[in-house]
């Protein structure tokens, strides 16, 4: 969790390592997206599950979801709302992966629902 994997490890398991990122990528990459979202005054926050590549937070996207937030939400509230969204997104991504419903084409995915 919150670790950057070596290129060697990623190469050994292409499209088999899933990352959950706590923002609706490509917005707010990096380690503190909820803080960045709060500072920008966003109206929605989200989560993205994607396959890990050597480029940080840039792998093929498997699943995404968003939740509406309001101007009075604190950073702590954004984190809590976001964590709830992350659970849903990660569980769907794992399910699709295990059921072999994900086709990777270059840096995009096709999901067979």
Question: What is the meaning of each model-derived region?
Answer:
Residues 1-113:
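Donor/substrate-binding cores of folate-linked one-carbon enzymes
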């Amino acid at each position: 969790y919150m670790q950057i994997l070596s290129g060697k490890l990623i190469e050994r398991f292409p499209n088999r390592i899933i990352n959950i990122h706590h923002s609706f990528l490509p917005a707010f990459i990096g380690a503190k997206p909820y803080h960045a979202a709060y500072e920008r005054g966003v109206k929605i926050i989200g989560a993205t599950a994607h396959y890990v590549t050597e480029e940080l937070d840039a792998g093929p996207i498997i699943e995404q979801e968003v939740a509406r937030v309001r101007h009075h939400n604190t950073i702590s509230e954004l984190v809590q709302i976001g964590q709830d969204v992350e659970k849903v997104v990660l569980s769907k991504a794992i399910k699709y992966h295990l059921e072999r419903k994900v086709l990777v084409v270059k840096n995009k995915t096709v999901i067979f629902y």
